[in-house]
């Protein structure tokens, strides 16, 4: 059972919601919101404290936080997303690999569990695209994907070599009604809801017919907590589990939104960088191992997610 938790990247797309979820749902827990300069916590994230500067590239800083709060679990959410990582590959490597190594070393010394998410971006064009198996060829062609595969391998290494309790999932594209997109290939599936609710034309950077696995943020947060609370004796895999919820292409998403907002207008301006990344990713993943080993099961499908997204964004924007 998690008690003292450090969330690194607490103000990002996943971290901002995950930090508050753990604070609400695990009685007596201390959840430290780790952040970097320029991405300070605000609002309820700050009000519910504690918060600490936590740069993954600063190992002594991380060790001091773990010692100060007697951290038992680290959520490492520091990363550049796929499209941004292609523009800044060296920075992506520094944050995602050198940063991870710092975290794993601190975890080894201080006996912490570590969750570092992987992604559908860890797969490449040689991967079976439909029903992508848990264990299969990966070979990504983006810097983001390369770092994710290396993350999986390094995390497994620290488990087998040093006994560090490392666990992770391969997140699909994540759709949130709370945080804005941050430079990912699947961001279009968030942005279109904002355009629809505001009555604006949406310019889609991904070509019609491009299927990708997606997931509503509440399911992703549940997975991140559920896996870290799971019985370790059941875990055959650790880094990283396929988890799936829904798979769709742009026209299917737009048609679903038009069931509730008929006036949605869309035109395509395909971004070749994002499209190339999307083409190399799976259309759908087989998550049977997660279901068997820790009882993973999503709650939302495309329709229920769309209803909730529109309702929440109307309250937020109008």
Segments from the language model and where they lie:
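SDR active-site strand-loop-helix element
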Residues: 8, 34, 74-80, 114-120, ...
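Rossmann-fold cofactor-recognition segment
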Residues: 46-58
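N-terminal Rossmann NAD(P)H-binding glycine-rich loop of SDR-like oxidoreductase domains
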Residues: 5-25
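NAD(P)-dependent short-chain dehydrogenase/reductase
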Residues: 156-211, 217-222
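Active-site helix of classical SDR
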Residues: 147
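C-terminal substrate-binding subdomain of Rossmann-fold SDR/epimerase-dehydratase oxidoreductases
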Residues: 205-207, 213-318
């Amino acid at each position: 059972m998690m008690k003292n938790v450090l969330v690194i990247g607490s103000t990002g797309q996943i971290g901002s919601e995950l930090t508050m979820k753990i604070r609400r749902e695990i009685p007596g827990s201390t959840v430290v919101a780790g952040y970097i300069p320029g991405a300070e916590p605000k609002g309820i994230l700050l009000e519910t404290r504690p918060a600490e500067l936590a740069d993954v590239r600063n190992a002594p800083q991380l060790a001091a936080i773990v010692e100060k709060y007697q951290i038992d679990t680290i959520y490492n959410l520091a990363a550049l997303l796929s499209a941004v990582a292609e523009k800044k590959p060296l920075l992506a490597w520094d944050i995602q690999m050198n940063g991870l190594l710092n975290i794993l070393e601190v975890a080894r010394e201080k006996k912490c569990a570590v969750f570092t998410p992987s992604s559908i971006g860890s797969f490449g064009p040689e991967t079976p695209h439909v029903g992508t198996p848990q264990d299969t060829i990966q070979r990504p062609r983006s810097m983001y994907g390369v770092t994710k595969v290396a993350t999986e391998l390094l995390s497994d290494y620290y488990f087998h070599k040093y006994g560090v309790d490392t666990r992770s999932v391969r997140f699909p594209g994540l759709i949130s009604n709370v945080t804005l997109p941050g430079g990912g290939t699947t961001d279009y599936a968030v942005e279109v809801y904002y355009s629809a609710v505001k009555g604006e034309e949406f310019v889609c950077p991904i070509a019609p017919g491009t299927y990708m696995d997606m997931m509503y943020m509440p399911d992703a947060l549940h997975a991140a907590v559920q896996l870290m609370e799971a019985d370790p004796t059941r875990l055959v895999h650790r880094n990283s589990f396929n988890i799936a919820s829904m798979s769709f292409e742009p026209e299917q998403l737009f048609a679903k939104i038009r069931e509730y907002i008929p006036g949605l207008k869309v035109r395509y301006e395909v971004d070749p960088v994002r499209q190339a990344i999307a083409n190399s990713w799976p259309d759908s993943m087989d998550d049977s191992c997660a279901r068997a080993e820790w009882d993973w099961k999503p709650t939302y499908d495309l329709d229920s997610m769309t209803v909730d997204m529109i309702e929440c964004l109307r309250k937020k924007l109008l």
